[in-house]
Amino acid sequence: MKTQVEFRSSKFPPYEGEQEQINPGLWGKRLDEYFVRKLSEKGIKTEEIIAEDWGWYIPVQNEGFRLAICCGHQDGDDDEFVCFTDPSTPVVKKFFKKIDATAQLTRLTEAMQQILSADPEIKEVVWKGPT
C-alpha cells in the first residue's frame, strides 16, 4: 500500500515565524490547513494540527488506533513537500493484538489522492510505499 506522497507546489509558503515552531528550513502548516479543509469536505474529521520537529501532524478521528497525516516541506527547493500516513502500513500492533487498518488507510489515502490530483497548483505527485 502506498502511504507516502511527494509533490511540488508553491501554494504553501511558510508563515512568518513558523520555522521557529518546528525546525529551520521546515514548514507545512498551510498545507496541513489545506488538507484539514479538503478532508472535511469529504466527510473525514480531523483534530487540531500539532507541530512536530519535522513538520506538522494532523490527527484523524478514528476508533481503535491512532490515524494521522504527517506533512512538511522536504529538503530541497521551497516547493517540495512530503506527506505520509500514520500508521504507514495496514497492520497496527496494539498491545498483544494486530489490527487491520486497511479500510481506514485506503479511505484516507484515496481522499488524499483525490485532493492532490484535483488541484492544478499541485504538480509532480509521486506515491510511494512506506520506507
Task: Name each model-derived stretch.
Residues 54-108:
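Amphipathic protein-protein interaction modules
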Residues 101-131:
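Intrinsically disordered, low-complexity regulatory regions enriched in serine/threonine/proline
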Residues 33-67:
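Short, intrinsically disordered low-complexity segments
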Residues 36, 93-96, 130-131:
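A domain-level signal for the structural core that forms small-molecule/cofactor-binding pockets
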Residues 23, 50-52, 123:
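Acidic, low-complexity intrinsically disordered regions
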Residues 28, 55-57, 128:
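Short linear interaction motif-like sites in intrinsically disordered regions of transcription factors
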Residues 1-36, 40, 44:
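N-terminal low-complexity, intrinsically disordered segments
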